Design a protein with these regions (language model features):
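Beta-propeller domains with acidic blade repeats across secreted/periplasmic ectodomains
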Residues: 1-145, 155-166
Length: 167
């Protein structure tokens, strides 16, 4: 794992293939809302386990690390959207893009929810000039099920895998 001090990691996604640059192949993306960041890792095998030898900043609204609204940053003050980027979920879409759910809450940790409007955003991360499309896959045939196994989205791959298992 990765020990970096106070925070509130919420979810990870494994980016295997898709439309992003090759350097993101095999990349683990971790949401950290208290630190306003998505961390990225290239896991390495170590015997029967794995290590995360280097932490990258994949995406952040707060490069100056002016943390506020987290249990470990009691003195910090919310500074607009810099501190309100709270990535709470990440997944890989069937189009190969990375999708990030962001919750605009002034507080993270404990039970101090302050977002009475329940506001947020979903961001799609993809190279600028990429034309995004969702491939049509028929999971009703064995050929389609095998094709689904090659999709960047683990959800689509699971559909193909579960149907193949029943075949």
């Amino acid at each position: 794992g990765d020990v970096y001090g106070g925070g509130s990691p919420t979810v990870i996604a494994f980016y295997e293939n898709g439309i992003m640059e090759d350097r993101f192949g095999g990349y683990v993306i971790s949401c950290e809302p208290a630190r306003n960041v998505l961390f990225g890792y290239h896991p390495k095998t170590a015997g029967a386990g794995i290590t995360l030898p280097q932490r990258d900043i994949f995406l952040t609204s707060n490069p100056e690390k002016n943390f506020a609204g987290a249990d470990f940053a009691r003195a910090g003050k919310i500074n607009g959207l810099i501190n309100l980027f709270r990535p709470s979920d990440v997944c890989i879409g069937p189009d190969g893009a990375i999708y990030v759910a962001d919750w605009f809450d002034a507080r993270v940790g404990g039970h101090g929810t302050r977002d009475m409007g329940q506001t947020g955003a979903i961001y799609r991360i993809a190279p600028k000039e990429t034309k995004l499309s969702i491939p049509r896959v028929s999971i009703n045939t064995i050929a389609g099920q095998i094709e689904a196994l090659q999709n960047p989205s683990p959800n689509v791959r699971e559909l193909g895998r579960s149907r193949l298992e029943k075949a």
